[in-house]
Curated annotation (Swiss-Prot):
Its EC number is 1.1.1.86. Belongs to the ketol-acid reductoisomerase family. Binds 2 magnesium ions per subunit. It comes from Corynebacterium aurimucosum (strain ATCC 700975 / DSM 44827 / CIP 107346 / CN-1). Mg(2+) 1 binds at D192, E196. The keyword Amino-acid biosynthesis applies. The gene is ilvC. NADP(+) binds at Y26, G27, S28, Q29, R49, S52, S54, D84, T85, S86, Q87, G135. It is an enzyme of class 1 (oxidoreductase). Pathway: Amino-acid biosynthesis; L-isoleucine biosynthesis; L-isoleucine from 2-oxobutanoate: step 2/4; Amino-acid biosynthesis; L-valine biosynthesis; L-valine from pyruvate: step 2/4. Its cofactor is Mg(2+). It catalyses: (2R)-2,3-dihydroxy-3-methylbutanoate + NADP(+) = (2S)-2-acetolactate + NADPH + H(+); (2R,3R)-2,3-dihydroxy-3-methylpentanoate + NADP(+) = (S)-2-ethyl-2-hydroxy-3-oxobutanoate + NADPH + H(+). The active site is at H109. This is Ketol-acid reductoisomerase (NADP(+)). Residues 1-183 form the KARI N-terminal Rossmann domain.
């Protein structure tokens, strides 16, 4: 059965246009949501913590900038787009004391609601609007008259308006131009975390590093190893994004395609799939989130230790040197770039 997909013709933009929306956070997604909502005729204010470096950017863009608490008190709909690990504290300290009956609290990701780290009162609508693309793409597509597909969900709906309100919001940021897919907080959260951990971040990251180690330990030059197991990955991913795995195989040489069919299952075999299932179980039963919370409460020490270990891997030095040769590659970690 085809998944339900909603478009502009299904949405009532006047619903969100009749609300005051506070965007908490002015990062990649916060900036895009705020700009698109404003361009769609919605009254928007930005909520930021005292001393935030984003205040000047938001003010230069012409937004009313308030503290998180002031924004929560002012708004009818509050979209919490701060980092996952900061959201519970922001909610407890700034948002919860200022919520009123009938307010709506929205999220761009379901983690804090699904795992009970944030528990709004029963008279608050809890919704999610999650564009499936980075903020700069959400904004650029909107300006071009297009949009990025969005997921929407409602976890708590005391007034029976959650679906219409989230759909209206999604339409206002351009999502309904491309397609809006209703889901649940549970499904969005668990699939998102699994994708990040088993494939997109954890899986690919360690596949690259292990491939680099195999080649260099066999005596090949680090530069050659980097080109073959890391640099060319973007070419492959772009082909998959554009037309699926079939398109990638079609676009590769017969040698690469044949070798991939033979060796892929040797590297990613049934035992890997079983361990991926273990990762999913840890997500579903809350094991991962408990460790995430413990890390935050411990001052991010475990995260910093893990980050330092990966950042010291030899592939990082090799990659940095080679990227200096590539005029078309911009290093986002280089503030002068």
């Amino acid at each position: 059965m085809a998944i339900e997909t909603l478009y502009d013709s299904d949405a009532d933009l006047t619903i969100i246009q009749g609300r005051k929306v506070a965007i908490i956070g002015y990062g990649s997604q916060g900036h895009a949501h705020a700009m698109n909502l404003r361009d769609s005729g919605v009254e928007v204010a930005i909520g930021l913590r005292e001393g935030s470096k984003s205040r000047e950017k938001a003010e230069e863009a012409g937004f009313k900038v308030l503290t998180n608490a002031e924004a929560a008190k002012w708004a009818d709909v509050i979209m919490l787009l701060a980092p996952d690990t900061s959201q519970a504290a922001i909610f407890t300290e700034d948002i919860e004391p200022n919520l009123e009956d009938g307010n709506a609290l929205f999220f761009g990701h379901g983690l804090n609601i699904h795992f009970g780290l944030i528990k709004p009162a029963e008279n608050i609508t809890i919704g999610m609007v999650a564009p499936k693309g980075p903020g700069h793409l959400v904004r650029r597509q909107f300006v071009d008259g297009k949009g990025v597909p969005c997921l929407i969900a409602t976890e708590q709906d005391p007034k029976g308006e959650g679906r219409e309100l989230t759909l209206s919001y999604a339409a206002a940021i351009g999502g309904a131009r491309a397609g809006v897919i209703p889901t649940t907080f549970k499904d969005e959260t668990e699939t998102d975390l699994f994708g990040e951990q088993a494939v997109l971040c954890g899986g690919v990251e360690y596949l690259i590093m292990n491939g680099f180690e195999v080649l260099t330990e066999a005596g090949y030059e680090p530069e050659m190893a980097y080109f073959e197991v890391c640099h060319e990955l973007k070419l492959i991913v772009d082909l998959i994004v554009e037309g699926g795995i079939k398109n990638m195989n079609y676009s590769c040489s017969d040698t690469a395609e044949f070798g991939g069919y033979l060796s892929g299952p040797r590297v990613i075999d049934a035992s890997v799939k079983e361990r991926m299932k273990d990762v999913l179980t840890d997500i579903q039963d809350g094991t991962f989130v408990k460790r995430l919370v413990a890390n935050v409460e411990g001052g991010n020490k475990e995260l910093e230790d893990l980050r330092a270990k990966v950042n010291s891997h030899p592939i990082e030095q090799t990659g940095s040197q080679l990227r200096d040769l590539m005029s078309w590659v911009k290093n986002p970690l280089d503030a002068t770039a």
